[in-house]
Amino acid sequence: MSETEAEASVIGIIELFHKYTGRDDMIDKPGLLKMLQDNFPNFLAACDKKGTDYLANVFEKKDKNRDKKIDFSEFLSLLGDIATDYHKQSHGAPACSEGDQ
């Protein structure tokens, strides 16, 4: 049986996470910032245009357990914020309307 579009999307998210993780299956701060710059340049540019430095403190906000690493659930929380912003854009909101989360 072939993958559905939703299944392929979830697998793609897992692959994206693994592309930037270390041996411990976690992403450090430089890795997270690189992942955002590599994969969400339009989102970051929109935030910069609004004067919001999204990269300045996103790591600290998402590292809920303060272990200086981003685990998969913290990564999903970050992607959820970005996806929510894109969803709001689909309803006419400006880009990076929630970029300072």
From Swiss-Prot:
The name on file for this protein is Protein S100-A7
Keyword field? Acetylation, Calcium, Cytoplasm, Metal-binding, Repeat, Secreted, Zinc
Which amino acid positions bind Zn(2+), per UniProt? Answer: H18, D25, H87, H91
Q: Binding positions for Ca(2+)?
A: D63, N65, D67, K69, E74
Cellular component (GO) terms are:
cytoplasm; extracellular region
This chain's source organism reads Equus caballus (Horse)
Q: Is DNA-binding one of the keywords UniProt gives this record?
A: no
Primary localisation category: cytoplasm
Quaternary state and interactors = Interacts with RANBP9.
Claim: GTP-binding is one of the keywords in the record: no
Q: Which residues form the EF-hand domain?
A: 8-42, 50-85
Residue numbers of N-acetylserine PTMs: S2
Its lineage reads:
Eukaryota, Metazoa, Chordata, Craniata, Vertebrata
What is a single molecular function from GO for this protein? calcium ion binding
* Tree of life domain: Eukaryota
Q: Where in the cell is it found?
A: Cytoplasm; Secreted
GO terms classed as biological process: endothelial cell migration
